[in-house]
Amino acid sequence: METVLSFSAIAVAIIVGLCALGTAVGFAVLGGKFLEGAARQPEMAPMLQVKMFIIAGLLDAVPMIGIVIALLFTFANPFVGQLAG
């Protein structure tokens, strides 16, 4: 049982770390491409900015789902119930 709990803690740490890393890389690419597009066509910068914020919101939703899964493994681990039964 301790092995399952320790591996669950490691899995939660990996999930949270990869969520943070993926979001950081995604925002870096998104911001870089926005700046490239705004520098190339300055008259389209407001429209690109609106689209960038929409994509940024969607980009934030993915790690939130990962954090929910990590919290599930932390507080309501489904694998512990299988060991007890």
UniProtKB/Swiss-Prot annotation:
Keywords: ATP synthesis, Cell inner membrane, Cell membrane, CF(0), Hydrogen ion transport, Ion transport, Lipid-binding, Membrane, Transmembrane, Transmembrane helix, Transport. It is found in: Cell inner membrane. SUPFAM superfamilies: F1F0 ATP synthase subunit C (SSF81333). One of its GO terms (cellular component) is plasma membrane. One of its GO terms (molecular function) is proton-transporting ATP synthase activity, rotational mechanism. Signal peptide: none annotated. The chain crosses the membrane at residues 10-30, 53-73. Pfam families: ATP-synt_C. It is a multi-pass membrane protein. The record marks D60 as: Reversibly protonated during proton transport. Belongs to the ATPase C chain family. F-type ATPases have 2 components, F(1) - the catalytic core - and F(0) - the membrane proton channel. F(1) has five subunits: alpha(3), beta(3), gamma(1), delta(1), epsilon(1). F(0) has three main subunits: a(1), b(2) and c(10-14). The alpha and beta chains form an alternating ring which encloses part of the gamma chain. F(1) is attached to F(0) by a central stalk formed by the gamma and epsilon chains, while a peripheral stalk is formed by the delta and b chains. F(1)F(0) ATP synthase produces ATP from ADP in the presence of a proton or sodium gradient. F-type ATPases consist of two structural domains, F(1) containing the extramembraneous catalytic core and F(0) containing the membrane proton channel, linked together by a central stalk and a peripheral stalk. During catalysis, ATP synthesis in the catalytic domain of F(1) is coupled via a rotary mechanism of the central stalk subunits to proton translocation. This is ATP synthase subunit c. It comes from Vibrio vulnificus (strain CMCP6). The gene is atpE.
